[in-house]
């Protein structure tokens, strides 16, 4: 059972992270917050992964320096999928892999909403959120009129708040 759930977690994490990579700095920033949250909360359980986490965050920060709007360097599918894979692996290394939902909720909602919408339409012939563009960052930019910078900063703020709430919930378990 754990193997199947692990495969599902990896698939979801890879795809939602990839779907989030559409605005300069968004996916990298959100992944930086998520990896940092896992590192802070589960430092004792992650062991040597803490060093890898610091390397990932340092690399992401250097990347974000050049990826801020307007970007001079792009991550692409290879980078965003690798980040999603790594986040899934560190989530499974903890004693609470369900913590992925708490600590990566903005990634899940932004990227996952489109996956759910497509799945329901293609396989179940159910149309939901017809007036909502997916991924959600596109809806914020094109339907709500947010600039790229506003999208990135507002999503980062939401992710930081979600990580803090996740920390409180996980510490109560």
Annotate the PLM regions.
Residues 3-6, 10-173:
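Alpha-helical transmembrane segments
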